[in-house]
């Protein structure tokens, strides 16, 4: 493909169009890459099913882009840099393993600002490990405690702590492409640090955990633990609103992949969103060790009869010892959308979905249960899903919800179907060759950090509207409003072994974009006018097609003499056009003929 980037004009947002043309007539289609100024999540679309991955602009930058960065290369230098950091600072940690025998604490007086994060990242192309394994097993021995606001951490392995690898207690923070390994409680936990913070508005809020991995976290019974406290990720007990996990993988932890537990003593926690995430083999460590006390769920979504209506979308859960997804006695209107649960429950003999204690207003759509070992259980409203009950699979088709009163009481609804795994042409790949000892990030992630399951357990054909999908289209989150000295144009491409995703291009102006991108997909929808653009012209489905970000686009707006697209906006932004190889490489903008070039 060829790309053309227009000079800056007075538009309020980034507009992205894909151009497909024959030799004679060009045509406009749709670009799938959303560009947002979302360091705080204000414009970040955390509920969209259009995007199966997210990454930040920082992940696209090189160390050299941060001209005034401070480089550190010892444990003492790291602590000193953290304690003296101020808004806009960039701390780059040289490759290596850094040992700490006590907790590293960033208190709530050390903060970045909206648009001016404090950035702490691993040196390019180097591994950085914070090794806390000298700590003894003790609930006070967290490895890293972040109580500050507006921090970004990238590419760091938090290893071996006596309790949590990271206790995240601040607000508006981002962890990207970090690893939480072999800690003796939860790898990363969102909860208060100040125990006098008694109300939800004082608890950690609006944090984004993106493309991180947690594994082998275990509270070993032989060290005084129980084996049932160490999750991969947790947002529990005392966490506030707006926290998001996006593109994370949690596997081989002694307890749960995700834990959103709440209790009556502290009351409901804030709504947590989990999207584009994968949980597998929780309840068994990578060396095969299994502790029966572990809860072993992929996604545990509550506890104690204390309700919060959490959101889980486009997630995959397989081979966990207990359930794939459970309400865990959360009596709220949970929203579970496009989830795949495959072969969970082999240790605890539980169903793939156990949500019979949720509120009657709970909504389940696009769920698919496969190779279940016990009945799925629901309370709420189900549509476009396949579930398992009493040794049979039932399909609820269509776009209308069916109220499921309580499948645990033997209630059944829908059409009896075969186990989805036995139906031909319904999954891209059902051959799971993952070994627990594999380098999972190398195996299951693209170069930009987003998840690529290589088609494993991804539905296709008549089941394609159900279940989780990865490696389709990505969002970019801008973090470096003022933090970087060099807001230059960056480019990212997804690399994978079995599927191809077109390279995505993102462009950053001197000031952050004020809202999410607005896009137009003529293949699925036609809007002649909205608040930002007006289109006049003819459409065609005979000009060929283009593959872009995993989508096949077939309907186009023909670029003819009478065709016009006008924009009505009032602040700086940029327009990106993407051409296929047959385009004549010429286009007229504001009456000026402009030539497209490669790149």
Where are these regions (language model features)?
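Acidic Gly/Asp/Thr-rich repetitive segments characteristic of extracellular carbohydrate-active
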Residues: 53-105
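Right-handed parallel beta-helix
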Residues: 117, 123-126, 149-160, 172-185, ...
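Ser/Thr/Gly/Pro-rich low-complexity, disordered linker/stalk segments of secreted
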Residues: 39-47, 482-515
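Short, surface-exposed beta-strand/strand-loop-strand elements in extracellular ectodomains
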Residues: 583-593
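Right-handed parallel beta-helix/beta-spiral solenoid domain characteristic of secreted/periplasmic
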Residues: 71-76, 95, 99-101, 111-163
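Sec-dependent signal peptide cleavage junction
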Residues: 3, 23-42
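Acidic, glycine- and Ser/Thr-rich low-complexity intrinsically disordered tracts
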Residues: 42-68, 227-228, 233, 358-488
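Extracellular beta-strand/beta-solenoid scaffold signature
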Residues: 103-108, 115-118, 132-144, 160-167, ...
